[in-house]
């Protein structure tokens, strides 16, 4: 794949939950994003291996059975493996969310966030902020 020249932000989305993948992909596309979807981490690493480059403006990761810290570490490895520049944001969405964190976003650093997903509006606000996209 080649880098797109239009202004539609591209999200590289790794989602291991089949039901969530379908609904979130649809919602993200309805919000106006170009979404490259991988059903699992192995495929995501395979896509980004070799000489080709898959352009993404943001990496969004939801791995089943992983703690937020584990998902962040894996997401950082994927972002580095993908040869994204030092300015590509990473957002992880933990599978299990403590009730008191539901609907919140935790800033780990300027480029890494944990989204304790409650609804698409929450994710939309975070993505808009990170991608400087006016929706």
Stretches with model-predicted labels:
Residues 17-21, 42, 61-70, 96-99, ...:
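Short acidic, S/G/P-rich loop/turn micro-motifs used as interaction or catalytic elements
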Residues 35:
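Short beta-strand element of Class I
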Residues 39-58, 62:
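Acidic, metal-coordinating helix/loop segments flanking the phosphotransfer/catalytic sites
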Residues 30-31, 81:
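Conserved dinucleotide-binding and phosphotransfer motif residues
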Residues 59, 83-100:
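A short, hydrophobic beta-strand element within the central beta-sheet of small alpha/beta folds
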Residues 69-73, 92-116, 121, 125:
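Alpha4 helix (beta4-alpha4-beta5 surface) of REC/receiver domains from two-component response regulators
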Residues 1-22, 27, 53-55, 83-87, ...:
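Non-catalytic signal-transmission and effector/linker regions of two-component phosphorelay proteins
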Residues 54, 59-86:
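Conserved phosphotransfer microenvironments
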């Amino acid at each position: 794949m080649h880098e797109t020249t239009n202004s539609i932000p591209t999200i590289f989305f790794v989602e291991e939950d089949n039901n969530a993948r379908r609904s979130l992909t649809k919602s993200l596309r309805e919000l106006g994003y170009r979404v490259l979807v991988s059903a699992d981490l192995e495929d995501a690493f395979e896509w980004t291996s070799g000489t080709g480059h898959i352009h993404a403006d943001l990496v969004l990761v939801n791995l089943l059975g992983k703690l937020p810290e584990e998902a962040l570490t894996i997401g950082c490895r994927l972002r580095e493996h993908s040869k994204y520049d030092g300015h590509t944001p990473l957002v992880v969405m933990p599978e299990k969310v403590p009730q008191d964190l539901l609907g919140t976003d935790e800033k780990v650093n300027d480029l890494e966030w944990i989204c304790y997903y409650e609804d698409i509006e929450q994710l939309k606000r975070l993505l808009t902020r990170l991608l400087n996209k006016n929706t």
